[in-house]
Each structure stands twice: as C-alpha cells, then as structure tokens.
C-alpha cells in the first residue's frame, strides 16, 4: 500500500502513478490496517462466504468446518486479506441483522485467534453488523453497497478500522437495476465512479478514518452493465491517479461471463486476464476466489514491472 496517503482525492498525480507506469511497492512486506501484507505485488483479498446461497460456491463454505478449511487454504496460498461475508450480494432470501451477525462474529473471533496477524475484512453494508465484526477482530470494512448506511464511516473510525468505498450508482443492496445509464458520453461511467468514490473516501477521512486505511472500489456488476465494466477496466489508471488505493472485485463476475459467453465455472481465464491488466495499471488489491492463481498472475506482473525479482534462476541470471 502507499506509505504516504494523498492529501486529497484531487491532488496532482504522484510520479509513480502517472499513466500506466509501475505502481508503488515496498520490498518484501508492507502493512495495511496494522497487519503485514505483501509489499512487492498487488494485494489479494480471499473470499470466504458464510452464506448458503453464494452466487459462485452455492454455500460451499457455509459450514464452520468448510469455512475454516477455506481460510487455511487461502492463507497457505498467499492471501493478504480474508474477506468474510454473511449475506449473498445478489437477490435472495432476506437475511436480518441478527442472522448476519450470527454467521460472522463467531467465525471472525475464531479467525482472529487462529491467525493473530492476518488482516481480516468484513463484507457488509450494515453499520450494526460492521460494529460487531470489528469488535470481534475485523480490521477492514468492505462496504460493497457504497455507503447505503451513512453510519459506516463512524464505525470504522471508532475501531480504527479501514474502509472500502464502493460505487453502486445508487443501486440498493441486493438489487440488479435494469438498463442502467450514465449519460451519453463515452466516459460517463468512469467520471461517475471517480466522483462518487473519491467523495466517499473524503467523507470517511472527515469522519475520522485514517487516510491510509481507505480504499476505493469501482464495484463491477454493481449498478453497471458489462459495457460499463469493460470501460472501467480500460480506465483503471484514471482511478489509480486519484491517489486512493484501488480494490478490484472481478472474480468470476458477469462482466467476464457475458464478455466471453461462458458459464460460471469457466470464468477463471477471463478473470485473470482482467486482473493482469488492472494490476499493470496500478490497482492495489484484488478480491478473489482463486488465491493461488491470482498470486502467480500478480507476481508475474510485478516482476515484469521491475518491482519483484524472479524467484529462482535457471538461465544464469545474476
């Protein structure tokens, strides 16, 4: 992550972030929210869904045992962040606050005990749930529905937690707007995303969230169609140039499936291609299902950019 955060979202672009040049990185390790993370590549946020109806794994990690196994694998594969969610993002059975807390809090308590130094994120749009999760040990609030609960920044500030500020285009939680429009200009969605997430990031800082703990997320598929998602991928550098660290949540999403015309189980290659492009443009974190494959892609991108040395030499490299 950036060692010196931006004074404001509108400041001039640091040289290291200009255009598509090499993103900032530290040798070996860095920290985020007080936890150790990789410093020589973009960061990996591993998804662990405590839901029976997740769009991707269909409840594969709903049980405690399966979820714990998923955490062990993710940590072994190199995840920097474990992102724990208790409600399916899309439409589905209603989940009240108490149920969401019951799914999340005991598991986060276990996770904090099992991995004391692991950066833990909670995926929720409800401030009440975020508060309980942070009290249980979460370090980062992944507010995927773009600040629909205005108390979220205050919760992050209260616990010294980080906050992800996402763009949803005004979509309400667990809805799929039809025929979304961002005006007639080619850059309409890009400008809208940048305007919303940078304003949200500044509000978070004003509420007391440490500037270096704030990330922005264009939130592919949330209040956007596939054409919007592809345009945002072409303009990742514009997001990076705001100075805020950029989180990309691309893993197995409809933007990949619709672009390639493939089913949910065949989206890995498209996800990794989009990941490589976004990482090369300077995105700093990726929320993913496949940790090991993503890590290899991000390490290769970092090595091409010259911020990570090769792991081994077989051709006489010095």
UniProtKB/Swiss-Prot annotation:
PROSITE patterns, A to Z: DHPS_1, DHPS_2, PTERIN_BINDING
Q: Which residues lie within the region annotated Disordered?
A: 1-25
* Name assigned to this protein: Inactive dihydropteroate synthase 2
User: InterPro entries, from UniProt?
Assistant: DHP_synth-like, DHP_synth_dom, Dihydropteroate_synth-like_sf, Pterin-binding_dom
> What family does the database annotate?
Belongs to the DHPS family.
Q: Where is this site: Characteristic for family members without dihydropteroate synthase activity?
A: 220
Q: Which SUPFAM superfamilies match?
A: Dihydropteroate synthetase-like (SSF51717)
Whom does it interact with, and what assembly results?
Homodimer.
GO cellular component entries: cytosol
A GO biological-process term: folic acid-containing compound biosynthetic process
Signal peptide as annotated in the record: none
Which NCBIfam families does the protein's record reference?
Answer: DHPS
Reported function: Has very low affinity for the DHPS substrate 6-hydroxymethyl-7,8-dihydropterin-pyrophosphate, but can bind the inhibitor dapsone. Seems to lack dihydropteroate synthase activity, and does probably not function in folate metabolism.
Q: Where is the Pterin-binding domain?
A: 42-299
Recorded superkingdom: Bacteria
């Amino acid at each position: 992550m950036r060692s010196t955060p931006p004074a404001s979202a509108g400041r001039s672009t640091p040289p290291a972030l200009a255009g598509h040049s090499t993103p900032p990185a530290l040798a070996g390790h860095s920290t985020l929210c007080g936890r150790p993370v990789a410093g020589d590549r973009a960061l990996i946020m591993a998804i662990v869904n405590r839901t029976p109806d997740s769009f991707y794994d269909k409840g594969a990690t709903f049980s405690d045992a399966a979820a714990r196994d998923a955490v062990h694998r993710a940590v072994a594969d190199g995840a920097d962040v474990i992102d724990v969610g208790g409600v399916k993002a899309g439409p589905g059975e209603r989940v009240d606050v108490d149920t969401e807390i019951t799914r999340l809090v005991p598991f986060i308590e276990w996770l904090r005990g099992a991995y004391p130094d692991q950066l833990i994120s909670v995926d929720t749009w409800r401030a009440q749930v975020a508060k309980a999760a942070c009290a249980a040990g979460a370090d980062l609030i992944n507010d995927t529905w773009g600040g629909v609960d205005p108390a979220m920044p205050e919760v992050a500030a209260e616990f010294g937690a980080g906050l992800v500020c996402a763009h949803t285009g005004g979509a309400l939680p667990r809805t799929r707007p039809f025929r979304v429009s961002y005006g007639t200009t080619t850059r309409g969605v890009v400008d809208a995303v940048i305007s919303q997430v940078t304003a949200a990031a500044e509000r978070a800082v004003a509420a007391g969230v440490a500037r270096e703990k704030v990330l922005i997320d264009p939130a592919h598929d949330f209040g956007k169609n596939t054409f919007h998602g592809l345009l945002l991928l072409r303009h990742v550098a514009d997001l990076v140039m705001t100075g805020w660290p950029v989180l990309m949540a691309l893993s197995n999403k409809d933007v990949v499936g619709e672009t390639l015309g493939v089913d949910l189980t065949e989206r890995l290659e498209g996800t990794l291609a989009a990941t490589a492009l976004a990482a090369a443009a300077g995105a700093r974190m990726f929320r993913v299902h496949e940790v090991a494959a993503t890590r290899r892609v991000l390490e290769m991108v970092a090595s091409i950019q010259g911020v990570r040395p090769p792991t081994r030499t077989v051709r006489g490299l010095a």
